[in-house]
């Protein structure tokens, strides 16, 4: 499996040798690529687990859930924000546990915003805590591994009253009110901690698949095509004939 560089992509020679080509369908007009390692994680996850077709909807934005990212590393959080923007999110909640996104040093904020491609990323980041889970009717926590229901089997296109949480560990979930949340798993290898940007990017890709793209409307009436057109002559070349004169013929 070959994954293209985010700036140059794959070479023509490599593409010509490919048996299959997979395109990750980003939905942003400004952030159109993922971090290359995150893209490899998304591609590898779908290659191993398969995928249904991407949905089509009249109003995909209405189906997109809210997203809460829990993170302590500023670069991982920034890369996750980049993926969120690429997959069509405009707002994200952040439980900042030392990532310094809101109050870190200038160097930390600069690195985090660089990872998020902040210069062209219109994403709005809102400060949040675990107490904010109570504001939502439906909360789904996504873990990187475990025996929980696979993420593909969960519906993650229920709109803004649904919250998807990424970045919590199994121990954190045990401290939450069990009756108020559901838990899904990506099914990654146990015992190996995956970076936050991998877990977030895979989750965001599955959300984008279920939320879908805008359904195209009926095609418009095509403009008429002409094989020839009348070319108007100058007034000097025009002879006006009175209809009464034609009666003499």
What is each residue range found by the language model?
Residues 5, 71, 190:
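Conserved residues at beta->alpha junctions
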Residues 1-26, 52, 145-187:
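Active-site/ligand-binding-proximal alpha/beta "capping" segment
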Residues 41-145, 200-249:
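RNA substrate-binding interface of SAM-dependent RNA methyltransferases
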Residues 9-10, 75, 194-195:
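Residues that form or flank phosphate/diphosphate-binding pockets in enzymes
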Residues 27-34, 189-194:
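Glycine-rich, Arg-bearing micro-motifs that act as flexible, cationic patches
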Residues 13-16, 34, 79, 198:
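Generic recognition of short, well-ordered alpha-helical segments
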Residues 36-39:
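A glycine-rich, Thr/Ser-enriched phosphate-binding loop motif common to dinucleotide/cofactor-binding enzymes
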């Amino acid at each position: 499996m070959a994954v293209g560089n985010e700036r140059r992509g794959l070479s023509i020679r490599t593409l010509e040798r490919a048996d299959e080509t997979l395109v990750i369908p980003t939905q942003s007009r400004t952030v159109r690529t993922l971090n290359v390692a995150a893209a490899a994680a998304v591609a590898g996850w779908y290659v191993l687990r398969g995928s249904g077709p991407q949905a089509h909807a009249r109003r995909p934005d209405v189906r997109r859930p809210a997203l809460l990212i829990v993170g302590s590393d500023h670069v991982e959080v920034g890369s996750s924000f980049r993926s969120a923007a690429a997959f069509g999110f405009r707002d994200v909640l952040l439980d900042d546990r030392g990532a310094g996104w809101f109050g870190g040093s200038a160097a930390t904020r600069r690195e985090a915003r660089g990872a998020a491609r902040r210069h062209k990323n219109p994403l709005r980041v809102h400060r949040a805590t675990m107490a904010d889970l109570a504001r939502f009717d439906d909360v789904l926590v996504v873990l990187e591994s475990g025996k929980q229901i696979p993420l593909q089997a969960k519906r993650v296109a229920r709109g803004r009253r649904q919250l998807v949480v990424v970045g919590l560990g199994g121990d954190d979930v045990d401290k939450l009110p069990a009756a108020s949340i559901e838990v899904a798993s990506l099914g990654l290898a146990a015992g190996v901690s995956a970076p936050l940007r991998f877990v977030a990017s895979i989750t965001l890709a599955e959300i984008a698949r279920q939320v879908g793209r805008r359904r195209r409307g009926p095609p418009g009436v095509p403009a008429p095509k002409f094989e020839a057109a009348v070319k108007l002559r100058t007034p000097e070349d025009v002879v006006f004939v009175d209809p009464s004169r034609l009666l003499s013929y």
